[in-house]
Amino acid sequence: MLTGAWAASILWTTNPILAQSSSSKFPLLTTEDTTVKKVAPKNWFNLDPKKDQVNGVGSERAYQELLKGRSSQSVIVAIIDSGVDIEHEDLKNKLWVNKGEIPNNGIDDDKNGYVDDVNGWNFIGGKDGKNVAQDTHESTRLYAKFKAKFSGKAESDIAPADKADFEIYQKAKAMYETKVAEYSGQKDMIDNYAMMFNKSERLLAAYLDTEQVTLEEVQGIETEDKVVGRAKQIMELFLANGLTKETIKDNQEQLGNMLKYGFDLNFDPRSIVGDDYNNKNERGYGNNDVKGPDASHGTHVAGIVAAERGNNLGMDGVAEKVQIMSIRAVPDGDERDKDVANAIRYAVDNGAKIVNMSFGKGFSPDKAVVDEAIKYAESKGVLLIHAAGNDGADTDKTGNFPTRDLNDGRKANNWLEIGALSWKSGEDMVAVFSNYGKNHVDLFAPGVDIYATTPNQKYQNNSGTSMAAPVTSGVAAVLLSYFPHLTASQVREILVKSTYKLPAQKVKKPSEAEEPEVVEFGQLSVTGGIVNVYEAIKEAQKIKLPKKR
């Protein structure tokens, strides 16, 4: 499942109003709630905590003070995601191009097993060009798989050979029922928002004699009319926080799809792909449509890493010398282990040095095949960067797959797990939705109100650990661009060692509790720190070049 605005915590990750209203600790928005939230500083994720007093990663400072005049080379970053809009104005010059492939000739020119894979590959599409848009959640698939066998049975009824499957069934059923109830409540809430927005907008449009109501016009209203005054309060709250008719509609559609497809026990779109699904080692299936039916999430992720710097368009990505390889493996729903494994292998085999994975799920029934792909990437020196998830949960206690924890008991040394940080300071520093874990989350990175590319030459703010992961991938790409001799494990070690340390900072621990527990930031990750490219470069400069033989 995508771990940004399209994730399970969709209402947490789209804007401040919805973020505060997505769990039981927050009431539905009422007309009495007129607080206008502060706005994130422009380009804040590229700013520096010391120079700019905001917890960005220091990329602007690094380019200005440490990297001027230094030679660099391009680094390939694979984005395993929903797809990337490769025609976007801020990305079209930053794409990986497979020079061994002649475009659209129907031939696998470079003999890599994939026909016409010019900019990447799509593992959730068919040879006929059709694509999987929606899919079920893994809990739905597992519940459906075992329902007929175990429904209505107690543990005492289960044969010893079936105990493990029965345990999976119980966990999947519990998660399925919890999530259906949660998303149904969220859908009711966003429908309520839509009703309030539309009524207020119609009233104010008539009052102002205009077709489209703007924030400036709303703020300029002075009236004794209580009805108009109440509508003003509502619209000002919505518009000042970036919540428009379009974003409300998007949320309604996303939640509607989750309920319509993600939790339908009878829905299975896999026939579109046309692979032998039970053959987990199968390669070469899919098609070359790297954008797919909805590239919103993947395009946003790609822009954070690589949007062209200094072109006076939209925004600047973290990394300058980078090529984006788009690998489509994540639908609207949960990704499948077979596709994740093949996506990692494709990235490695085709030259990626960094793989960004802004997705995750609570079950991994074919974990072994993903583990083998992770170990393959490790053996080839490829760094894997993974979003920690948006459930406000302790991942030391709950599963978030894929994971660095391998079935053989070893931990992959080419893996970084990333939590999300807000632009706010003090106790509000950690994103309210971010997963955390003293042993499983390595570090935090900016992940709230990140302004980046979206399809069709657009840009928007999104939030999630989905955004924090590509910020970190961008930092890693800067290091490898200027210090190409570094290995994946060295880059990982540098990023961990050079974090901007705030271990004793008191922060609110992400939670659904009415009164969030205040803990030290150091309790939420391995490092108690924020990724920082400025400090990472200084650390990388200490590592000597390997001797030539």
Label each PLM-derived region with a short phrase.
Residues 18-54, 60, 65:
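Primarily auto-inhibitory N-terminal propeptides
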Residues 328, 356-360, 387-388, 419, ...:
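A cross-family glycoside hydrolase active-site/sugar-binding cleft signature
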Residues 1-24:
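Bacterial Sec-dependent N-terminal signal peptides
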Residues 63-71, 292-295, 316-319, 335-356, ...:
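Mature extracellular/periplasmic domains of secretome proteins
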Residues 81, 389, 464:
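Active-site glycine-centered loops adjacent to acidic/histidine catalytic or metal-binding residues
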Residues 270, 382, 403-481, 485, ...:
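Extracellular S/T/G-rich loop segment that most often corresponds to the catalytic His/Ser-adjacent loop
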Residues 63-77, 84-99, 103-276, 280-336, ...:
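Subtilisin-like serine protease catalytic core
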Residues 348-350, 354-357, 368, 413-417, ...:
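C-terminal subdomain of the subtilisin-like protease fold in secreted/lumenal serine endopeptidases
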